[in-house]
């Protein structure tokens, strides 16, 4: 096919890139015209408004774009016309027609057919010897197959191309602006469902990749176009039901073994085992809910037997060898991590007798068949190969059915996962990621995940994220960025906290003492930054148990104030103390010489949590001389104790800090990270932009053409009871509820008054 040049332009100053073109669809030049020299008239290509049309979700799934190699031409002198036309729909092709004989003299049946040589970009070579004069007038026309009666001409004046003086053997390339064809609004429907919930008769107690193909059939049958699933990454830490949370993965690459379709694998040679597993499969499928632990044990046992039976043959195939070569970077550490996790009975690598961190020197022995190390990890290679093969097959099947498979990228990873074990420099392990309080969680959310060391990640161009996105593109054509706000700032909670109230945004512009006093609030560090505990607070929180709490958990600080005893001065210490007391086994517990119920113990524990978080300001995690207003402190006792004038001063400070002070800063932080990531693949990018959303978030999503998430039952405008779909932006995902909210059917039965109001005002039914 000859040489192909793929390139882009950038503006450099002092060795630093100040600006560069859109990288997802770079310029492309095939040297197929047989010339001895090429002269190219390019134009700068910024991120287009309709960039979603270039995504694999649209071009490869919906439109079934078929790229072709341009035909080889042998003209003495050649003019190449190159233009982008992402608006074309399935079955359409592009032609160029004009006043010159070589362009058909405005007759469609003589128009020059063009070749789609890159995504959304078409080209045609023109023989200069058939041109007269130094100008060409032309237009581009979209044609339905070979039916010229269904031609759509671009609007506007004729395009004019002025030819330069050309020598024999020269090829002149004109890169023209996008075709002027109408952009039909693209609206598609879809379904969101976890793979694990897709149980069918062929399942083994849990939904698998075989069931995913059945779901793809249903989506296509109902004329939907998108099937979104929850994360499918491996989350195995303890081999118990606590591993079932899909947003705490141990590897951003590895797939969870529960999703393997056993029915698509060779049968077990052991007849007795085969019959036993078939009976177990039937039993697990009949359960009303997934028995996570039994399913895991059964599938792992089955795969171990199949590996012993068939593993050596499979791992000798070219397909496996290619898989291993393409994924070796992450696969080898992952397999060793899994082996060590199972050997030591814990995913907490800090407690392992050895191998506290991945050692690159181990790679060779772990990758060489016949070594002892290889024998310990080969099973995990084998399982991941099966999973990757089946998921790749499901992805190809979805494309055949014109269905977009949409994945989900969790914002965090497990603190005790392989990613942290392998590359700890990318993570901050002295804090916990979470979310501020909202309508669903008054104490905020503490996910327990480590936060990212963004400075370290940016040092190598966010390659950790780029590799993550590129791996995901093997299986999906669209993805949801879970908690996209984390790329602006993350809610970082101290490691000693259970709830999220003592968190702070990181990064953020914390306040100095002088800045706080600038709002009119006299700075009192001891009063504002330590738990506000008085007798009236204790009476309000604990009622008749106030004296008991004073005697056992507190000590006097002054005549008026108390402080927590050292043994209980953090929420984690309180949690550990009460852990045995609140074990829900129906037994009463001895509690400082008195019996107590589980409920009473939980109430005391939660009250102590509340005391510890009752502060007006939180000290910055990195600079002890700077402070953050504590989130939602207006509902707490320390705020209640302020004079009315001080409350007004504090409220002004609070609103400025959370809603104005950091906006431009957070915008800059997001723009340092997200552009690199959204350009890493051609997947369609969708954001989950819910929660405490600063005003800079829409700026970034719009600038990068990222789809927002609009939940009709939880509108972003607080003045609306329900979201109005006609007001949602075109670049958005519209849904009635998200994966962590009740489904439409469940919501319909929760509150009949609200349901009736929705029925009347949104559906316009009497």
Each model region followed by its residue ranges:
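Catalytic cores of glycan-processing enzymes that make or break glycosidic bonds
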Residues: 50-76, 80, 127-130, 161-766
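Aromatic-rich carbohydrate-binding modules that target alpha-glucans
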Residues: 1-4, 10-33, 87-135, 143-166, ...
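Catalytic "initiation/cleavage/transfer" segments centered on a nucleophilic residue
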Residues: 36
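Aromatic/hydrophobic beta-strand junction motif of beta-rich domains
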Residues: 81-85
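N-terminal nucleotide-handling cores and adjacent loading/scaffold lobes of large enzymes
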Residues: 41-44, 51
């Amino acid at each position: 096919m000859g040489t192909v040049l793929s390139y882009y332009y950038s503006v450099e100053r002092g060795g630093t890139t100040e600006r560069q073109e859109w990288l997802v669809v770079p310029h492309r030049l095939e040297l197929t015209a047989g010339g001895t020299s090429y002269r190219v008239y390019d134009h700068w290509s910024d991120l287009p408004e309709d960039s979603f049309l270039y995504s694999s979700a649209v071009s490869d799934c919906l439109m079934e774009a078929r790229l072709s190699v341009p035909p080889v031409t042998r003209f003495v002198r050649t003019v190449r016309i190159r233009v982008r036309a992402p608006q074309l729909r399935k079955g359409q092709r592009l032609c160029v027609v004009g006043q010159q004989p070589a362009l058909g003299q405005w007759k469609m049946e003589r128009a020059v057919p063009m070749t789609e040589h890159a995504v959304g970009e078409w080209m045609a070579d023109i023989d200069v010897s058939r041109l007269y004069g130094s100008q060409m007038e032309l237009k581009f026309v979209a044609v339905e197959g070979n039916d010229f009666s269904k031609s759509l001409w671009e609007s506007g004046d004729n395009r004019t191309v002025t030819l330069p003086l050309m020598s024999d053997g020269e090829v002149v390339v004109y890169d023209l602006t996008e075709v002027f064809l109408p952009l039909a609004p693209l609206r598609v429907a879809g379904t969101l469902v976890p793979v694990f919930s897709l149980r069918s008769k062929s399942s083994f107690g849990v939904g698998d990749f075989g069931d995913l193909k059945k779901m793809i059939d249903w989506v296509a049958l109902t004329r939907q176009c998108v099937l979104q699933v929850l994360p499918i990454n491996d989350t195995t830490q303890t081999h118990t039901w606590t591993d079932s949370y899909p947003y705490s993965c141990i590897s951003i690459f590895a797939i969870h073994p529960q999703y393997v379709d056993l029915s698509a694998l060779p049968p077990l040679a052991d007849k007795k085992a085969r019959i036993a597993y078939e009976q177990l499969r039937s039993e697990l499928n009949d359960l009303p809910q997934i028995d996570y632990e039994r399913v895991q044990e059964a599938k792992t046992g089955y795969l171990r037997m199949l590996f012993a039976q068939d593993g050596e043959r499979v791992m000798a195939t070219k397909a496996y060898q290619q898989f291993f070569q393409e994924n070796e970077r992450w696969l080898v550490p992952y397999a060793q991590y899994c082996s060590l996790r199972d050997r030591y009975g814990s995913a907490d690598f800090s407690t392992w007798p050895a191998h506290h961190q991945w050692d690159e020197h181990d790679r060779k022995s772990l990758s060489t068949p016949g070594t002892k190390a290889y024998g310990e990890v080969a099973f995990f290679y084998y399982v991941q190969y099966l999973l990757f093969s089946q998921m790749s097959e499901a992805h190809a099947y979805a494309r055949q059915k014109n269905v977009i498979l949409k994945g989900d990228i969790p914002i965090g990873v497990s603190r005790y996962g392989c990613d942290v074990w392998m590359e700890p420099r990318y993570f901050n392990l002295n804090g916990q990621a979470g979310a501020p309080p909202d309508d669903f969680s008054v104490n905020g959310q503490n996910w327990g995940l480590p936060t990212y060391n963004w400075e370290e990640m940016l040092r190598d161009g966010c390659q950790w994220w780029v590799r993550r996105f590129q791996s995901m593109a093997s299986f999906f054509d669209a993805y949801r960025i879970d908690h996209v706000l984390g790329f602006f700032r993350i809610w970082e909670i101290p490691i000693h906290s259970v709830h999220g109230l003592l968190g702070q945004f990181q990064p953020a512009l914390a306040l100095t003492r002088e800045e706080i006093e600038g709002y009119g609030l006299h700075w009192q560090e001891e009063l504002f930054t330590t738990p506000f505990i008085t007798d009236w607070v204790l009476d309000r929180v604990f009622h008749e148990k106030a004296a008991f709490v004073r005697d056992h958990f507190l000590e006097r600080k002054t005549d008026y104030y108390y402080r927590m005893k050292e043994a209980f001065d953090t929420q984690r210490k309180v949690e550990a103390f009460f852990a045995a007391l609140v074990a829900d086994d129906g037994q009463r517990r001895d509690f400082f010489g008195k019996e107590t119920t589980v409920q009473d113990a939980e109430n005391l524990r939660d009250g102590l949590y509340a005391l510890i978080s009752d502060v007006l300001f939180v000290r910055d995690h990195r600079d002890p001389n700077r402070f953050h207003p504590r989130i939602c402190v207006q509902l707490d006792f320390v705020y209640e104790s302020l004079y009315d004038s001080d409350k007004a001063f504090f409220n002004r400070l609070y609103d400025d800090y959370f809603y104005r002070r950091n906006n431009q800063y957070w915008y800059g932080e997001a723009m340092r990270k997200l552009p690199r990531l959204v350009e890493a693949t051609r997947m369609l990018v969708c954001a989950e932009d819910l929660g405490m959303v600063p005003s800079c978030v829409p700026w970034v999503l719009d600038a990068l053409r990222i789809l927002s998430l609009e939940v009709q039952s939880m509108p972003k405008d607080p003045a609306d009871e329900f979201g109005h779909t006609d007001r949602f932006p075109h670049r958005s995902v519209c849904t009635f509820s998200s994966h962590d909210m009740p489904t439409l059917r469940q919501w319909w039965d929760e509150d009949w008054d609200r349901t009736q109001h929705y029925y009347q005002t949104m559906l316009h039914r009497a």
